Design a protein with these regions (language model features):
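Flavin (primarily FAD) cofactor-binding/catalytic cores of flavoenzymes
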Residues: 2-47, 51-53, 82-383
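Glycine-rich flavin
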Residues: 63-82, 231-239
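Glycine-rich loop at the start of a catalytic domain that most often binds anionic cofactors/ligands
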Residues: 58
């Protein structure tokens, strides 16, 4: 259990101000603001250690953004500001951030249900329960690994991993590897695997950031990209409202590992995997690949079925406006992809969104009793 676990625990009859569910960068950033507002809060995280969401990813992963953009509110990221931190450095930073500000994080807590009893929210995790006036969903959108139905028809001899399970090539069987998915994770994992295995990557290209990734880009290009991601490609601008749905459907452009890098490493590139025939993957052009391993870099499904509140559209989409769930006063969300901007699930994005959400929560807290709705807080001029 985390060293911060002594701060707050479930107590019968005690009503907290806020329960934040999720102790990654989004939950920690917002928690920092809420503690500064002198709120009685707890941050619940399913992992055994703060930062494990990063720590448990593939070994060679580095952040796409330079360190000067990777800090959270109140604590700059240490070290080389133009360098690109490893996933372990990012994990350790988050752990240090929670300790530095004394954030009341409880680790190893798997929330089963969020509901309501009377005026308060109830958060259940096994035999434990918390009551609160506010709940923040900070679990992101990467809940359930998504793989196609036909994956189950691959031959038993084919080793299958989702990108969330991949750490390094020692997990793989001898023989060719097929990486399914041509996004950033697919490209990076394919390049990693190609050092020891014959590798093919399958999928539709998502485009590329047309600059070479490195220190020069960190100095001159990423400040422009960051500004656009924070202030232009948002639902608050006409261009953002047009572009964001397309970006959400199409996927992010390749940032560090480009098609030319894959070609230089000898990685074969093919079209989409559309089926399985005789236990082998079938490509859109009808060709069949004989491989010993498949790594599914096919993303995740959102799963908020444990939130037992009238906060969703018919298709299960959370109804929120910049993190505020107006249909359920006191319910908020942060760190979700495209929640407000293209950067909403990134480190720079959660820093911006956490400050905004904390202002909204403060406005609701101080609103007159007759104006308790989130709409009333919005009309009070919170921006």
């Amino acid at each position: 259990m985390d060293e911060n676990n002594h701060h707050t625990h479930s107590e019968p009859g005690r009503v907290l101000d806020t329960v934040v569910i999720g102790g990654g960068q989004a939950g920690l950033a917002l928690g920092h603001h809420l503690v500064r507002q002198h709120r009685d809060i707890v941050i619940l995280d399913a992992y055994d250690r703060v930062g494990d969401a990063w720590r448990l990813r593939w070994d060679s992963l580095r952040l796409f953004t330079p360190a000067k953009f990777d800090g959270l509110p109140g604590l700059p990221f240490p070290g080389d500001r133009l360098g690109f931190p490893t996933k372990d450095e990012q994990a350790d930073y988050l752990e240090a951030y929670a300790a530095h500000f004394g954030l009341p994080v409880e680790t190893g807590v798997h929330v089963d249900r969020v509901g309501r009893i009377g005026a308060h929210f109830v958060v259940d995790a096994g035999a434990r329960q918390w009551e609160a006036r506010n709940v923040v969903l900070a679990t992101g959108g990467c809940h359930e690994p998504r793989v196609p139905e036909f994956a189950g028809r691959l031959a038993a001899s084919v080793r299958q991993l989702h990108s969330s399970e991949y750490r390094n090539a020692t997990q793989l069987r001898p023989g060719p590897v097929l990486v399914v998915g041509m996004g950033n994770s697919g490209a990076e994992i394919a390049l990693d695997v190609s050092r020891s295995h014959a590798t093919t990557v399958a999928g539709t290209p998502t485009g590329e950031l047309p600059v070479r990734h490195g220190r020069a880009a960190a100095r001159f290009v990423f400040p422009v990209v960051r500004f656009a991601g924070l202030h232009v490609l948002t639902f608050g601008t006409p261009i953002g409202r047009r572009a964001l749905p397309k970006l959400a459907h199409h996927g992010d452009p390749l940032i560090r590992t480009k098609a030319a890098d894959l070609d230089a490493a000898g990685v074969a590139r093919v079209g989409r995997v559309v089926d399985v025939r005789d236990g082998k993957p079938v490509i859109a052009d009808g060709s069949v690949l004989d491989v010993a391993n498949v790594i599914w870099c096919t993303g995740f499904r959102d799963d908020l079925t444990w939130v037992d509140l009238p906060a969703f559209d018919d298709d299960g989409t959370l109804r929120q406006r910049r993190g505020v769930v107006e249909s359920v006063p006191g319910l908020y969300a942060i760190g979700r992809e495209f929640m407000y901007a293209v950067t909403s699930a990134t480190l720079p994005g959660v820093s911006r969104d956490s400050a905004y959400l904390a202002r909204r929560m403060r406005a609701r807290r101080t609103a007159p009793a007759s104006a308790t709705s989130e709409t009333a807080a919005s009309s009070a001029g919170v921006r």
